[in-house]
């Protein structure tokens, strides 16, 4: 029986899963919005949100913890310089999951994962 077992395996071994979420969370912090499957998005939330909570207090110790989990110097820098101060007053819920249809190849349900309160990109269309 698998009662009270949390987390999805996603047809990967543990090292592959760990590397995948490490890369996905670094991409999320860099681009502030990524597209993935719904199952991966729900699992990514559990990886990314504690890192943002950690970044709310900037210290050498917290930076080292974040780097040990992300292994991406640029992502850790942005996490502590931009994202931590941005969510200083928010007690949680930094990630939003928006369902966006199905993937054409295998009909997998897809979703956008975005950071809440991210700056909106202005459209580049010229208004005539």
Swiss-Prot record:
GO terms for cellular component: cytosolic large ribosomal subunit. Signal peptide: none annotated. SUPFAM superfamilies: Prokaryotic ribosomal protein L17 (SSF64263). One of its GO terms (molecular function) is structural constituent of ribosome. InterPro entries: Ribosomal_bL17, Ribosomal_bL17_CS, Ribosomal_bL17_sf. Pfam families: Ribosomal_L17. GO terms for biological process: translation. PROSITE patterns: RIBOSOMAL_L17 (PS01167). It comes from the Bacteria. Keywords: Ribonucleoprotein, Ribosomal protein. Belongs to the bacterial ribosomal protein bL17 family. Part of the 50S ribosomal subunit. Contacts protein L32. This is Large ribosomal subunit protein bL17.
């Amino acid at each position: 029986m698998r009662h009270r077992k949390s987390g999805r395996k996603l047809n990967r071994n543990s090292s592959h899963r760990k590397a995948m979420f490490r890369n996905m969370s670094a991409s999320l912090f860099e681009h502030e919005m990524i597209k993935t499957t719904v199952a991966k998005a729900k699992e990514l939330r559990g990886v990314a949100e504690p890192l943002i909570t950690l970044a709310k207090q900037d210290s050498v110790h917290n930076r080292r913890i974040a780097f040990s989990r992300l292994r991406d110097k640029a992502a850790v820098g942005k996490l502590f310089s931009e994202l931590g101060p941005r969510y200083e007053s928010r007690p949680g819920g930094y990630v939003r999951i928006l369902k966006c249809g199905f993937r054409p190849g295998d009909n997998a349900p897809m979703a956008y994962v975005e950071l809440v309160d991210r700056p909106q990109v202005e459209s580049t269309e010229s208004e005539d």
